[in-house]
Amino acid sequence: MTIQTPNGFTLDNSGKRIVVDPVTRIEGHMRVEVNVDENNIIRNAVSTGTMWRGIEVILKNRDPRDAWAFTERICGVCTGTHALTSVRAVENALGITIPDNANSIRNLMQLALQVHDHVVHFYHLHALDWVDVVSALSADPKATSALAQSISDWPLSSPGYFKDIQTRLKKFVESGQLGPFKNGYWGNASYKLPPEANLMAVAHYLEALDFQKEIVKIHTIFGGKNPHPNWLVGGVPCPINVDGTGAVGAINMERLNMVTSIIDQLIEFNDKVYVPDIMAIGSFYKDWLYGGGLSGKNVLAYGDVPEHANDYSEASLKLPRGAIINGNLAEVFPVDHADPEQIQEFVTHSWYKYPDESKGLHPWDGITEPHYELGPNAKGTKTNIEQLDEGAKYSWIKAPRWRGNAMEVGPLARWVIGYAQNKAEFKDPVDKVLKDLGLPVTALFSTLGRTAARALESQWAGYQMRYFQNKLIANIKAGDSNTAFVDKWKPETWPKEVKGVGFTEAPRGRLAHWIRIKDGKIDNYQCVVPTTWNGSPRDPTGNIGAFEASLMDTPMSNPTQPLEILRTIHSFDPCLACSTHVMSPDGQEMARVQVR
């Protein structure tokens, strides 16, 4: 059956059905089903979240000052960003302000997360969708060295270094214990890199394992631990004592100097490894511009990284805010989190129930009541689904919409909005990438563009960290050591009933928490996370979400090896892990693969 969606996609589910399940992430597990035509081109895509989060239910009647500690556990990869969003929601509801030092420290922690998440995502979750590890065994180490030195002056680029990496890789392969490289689609026709580029990428994959351990030390310095650092309504929980005396764990100059050193390291890694690798890989995939989906149509960002404490206006935010509709870069619409006409969640195709499912609810009025049922055209059972019925309920993810539109969120959305706003810090790097690769601006709206935007954002975040670190040190030297305001800490100072919203730009996209507080306790709590936007099912009018849209019209080299599906889905950074099964239309396993 062929369907034309309101947001401009033609769906045809009459072809062969391919099921990828489970594709897992921290918020839950993900399943993808596609229909391909006789030429193995994807003509229909169905994305579903197969696990109920339920944090909103857990939080009801709890102390709002503790909400951050619960919501932070939603995700163990983008650790801390839910906590920051939560404390901002409570502060917004109760009118609590934070000191300047707390604003700088929060920005440092959030930006450190951006860099950490982007680096780990690309090298350890996404790179192997572009890089053929086995091909690296046939590379010439001297030619690999020449390639590496032609794109960067990174010191680990000698022929001997790459020879050692190749030898280690060969022993690894010959041992039969492939670990993260097991069951890859090595040799698939969709791999385009020469052996030398593959060897260089494998070397940097290994280097990034060590590098990511250093970045998280910033969270342990300011937040006490990682993952899940500590946060505080009204500021940050770390006192400042530059003379080294006082509370255990207080921030002193030794620890501040360590943060400065880590920032210098991550800037160098971004400049000399991550961004050059993206450019090198991109140069071989210039003709693989699939996966754009909604990115060239509808994108959305809340904005984040406030310059000034307690100022979340668009002018204060370093990351851009706004919405673009129908691909019109000439107009960026303002975004208001509190406007019930702007943001609504639908459950027509989600395993929840509303009193009237033809209408969406603003998160302040949101309902999280599970209602698990399979549609009449589904195959299998509730505990063993063989094929979903996308005409009915088919996902544990709700369908958020901005003024009725399905939207893409994430680094690409942020950079498209910054580009459209003609902000030099976003537009100039994008223009340079496009010019160096010889690509038009429309190439930005693709899987490759989404991957490049994440690298550019990691680079941008490193320099912003240096800025806020210098700002923090200057403020401390000026005599300001405040890190928290606690004048409204006690519940007896709060209104009887109040509501608020907190927002951030998580590494994977716009994130917001809406809270209602009544009699000092949480009366209602709703989270709308990046994957809710990108992984949303269809809405009452038939609009498809960003994941589903991105897979449309993508050709597959081999349907039993869904490399192209994973390449595009991974580009959104849905924290994939565990194993994936590919099923034939009759439910029989065709192949088993390990997603890395």
Swiss-Prot record:
Its EC number is 1.12.99.6. This enzyme recycles the H(2) produced by nitrogenase to increase the production of ATP and to protect nitrogenase against inhibition or damage by O(2) under carbon- or phosphate-limited conditions. Binds 1 nickel ion per subunit. Ni(2+) binds at C75, C78, C575, C578. InterPro entries: Ni-dep_hyd_lsu (IPR001501), Ni-dep_hyd_lsu_Ni_BS (IPR018194), NiFe-Hase_large (IPR029014), NiFe/NiFeSe_hydrgnase_LSU (IPR050867). GO terms for cellular component: plasma membrane. Heterodimer of a large and a small subunit. Belongs to the [NiFe]/[NiFeSe] hydrogenase large subunit family. The keyword Membrane applies. It is an enzyme of class 1 (oxidoreductase). One of its GO terms (molecular function) is ferredoxin hydrogenase activity. This is Uptake hydrogenase large subunit. PROSITE patterns: NI_HGENASE_L_1, NI_HGENASE_L_2. It is found in: Cell membrane. It is a peripheral membrane protein. The keyword Plastid does not apply. Its cofactor is Ni(2+). Keywords: Cell membrane, Membrane, Metal-binding, Nickel, Oxidoreductase. Its main location: membrane. It catalyses: H2 + A = AH2.
